[in-house]
Design a protein with these regions (language model features):
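Short, mixed-charge, low-aromatic patches
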Residues: 2-6, 43-47, 113-119, 163
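Generic anion/oxyanion-binding catalytic loop in active/binding sites
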Residues: 6-9, 145
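Glycine-rich, acidic loop regions that bind phosphate or pyrophosphate groups
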Residues: 64-173
Length: 173
């Protein structure tokens, strides 16, 4: 069994991380889609820290285990495949969006921002791009994003928290 161990999670690419930090440091009304994540207490705590540091409104998905505390003041409600009500309003009023391994991010963005309508910068943290080659097309749509960080949310959130703690001049690579 030792010969079949899982590889370590990839670190976020430096340029993508710097671009994400630049977007988030300027954001006044960020929004976080809290998607898939581990059951780790430290990952849970880091998601809360990120939302609080950014003062970002958050949502979770009905089909996933909780990705953010539903009693937290920054949580505005959970959603399924259709975005509506206060969740949709918060997404549309956001000036930056972070998708933490969200289910079908491409469809979520299309529902919130119809083709031709303006939308904020989107940071996608997910390894889902690996499945966007399947012949059956049952993976959902490829999300059109401004920054793609190909790793698991816990690794990227930790790096974002570290980067947001630094002065803006230290974030440039």
């Amino acid at each position: 069994v030792a010969h079949f161990s899982s590889p370590e999670d990839a670190e976020p690419p430096k340029k993508a991380l710097a671009k994400a930090l630049n977007i988030l440091s300027k954001a006044e009304k960020p929004f976080i889609f809290c998607g898939r994540g581990s059951r780790s207490q430290s990952e849970w705590d880091d998601r809360i820290k990120l939302a609080e540091r950014l003062n970002a409104r958050t949502t979770t998905h009905l089909k996933l285990p909780a990705g953010f505390p539903t009693t937290h003041p920054l949580f505005i409600g959970e959603t399924g495949w259709r975005l509506k009500g206060p969740v949709l309003d918060a997404i549309r009023s956001a000036d930056a969006i972070v998708m933490l391994d969200w289910l079908d991010g491409g469809n979520a963005l299309k529902l919130a921002f119809p083709p031709g309508s303006p939308r904020p910068s989107v940071i996608n943290i997910s390894n889902d791009f690996h499945i966007h080659r399947g012949w059956s097309m049952d993976y959902g749509g490829l999300a059109a994003v401004d920054v793609s960080i190909p790793t698991v949310p816990s690794t990227a959130v930790s790096a974002l928290l570290d980067g947001l703690a630094k002065p803006a001049s230290a974030r440039q690579l």
